[in-house]
Amino acid sequence: MKKIVCAVVALLLTLPAWANVNAHEEARINAMLNALAQKKDLTFVRNGDAHNCEEAVSHLRLKLGNTRNRIDTAEQFIDKVASSSSITGKPYIVKIPGKSDENAQPYLHALIAETDKNVE
């Protein structure tokens, strides 16, 4: 029984290594982040602190680097990584002048739908 438990634990520890963003999904994520970097009037709010688009993209690229072996798709990146704080769990907020504030998750899904038109 002890050997079975050890084998199951060892298997579970290797599971994150099976997930990996492939080249196409990475291209989708990068296209979305590049488009986000061009949104000069956008303010990205993380844990109550406002950041310009360049700071937001830098932070999201750092998070991508830390999680790329635990996600498979751009949608998983948005849902599990790019939309909320991994420390506090608070959703990120997108502020655009003249529009209502919105959670980053639907904004990023809309942005990737837009940028997917140019990704092969």
From Swiss-Prot:
Keywords attached to this entry: Signal
Signal peptide from the UniProt entry: 1-19
Pfam families xrefs: DUF5329
InterPro entries, A to Z: DUF5329 (IPR035242)
This protein's name: Uncharacterized protein YfeK
Organism encoding this protein: Salmonella typhimurium (strain LT2 / SGSC1412 / ATCC 700720)
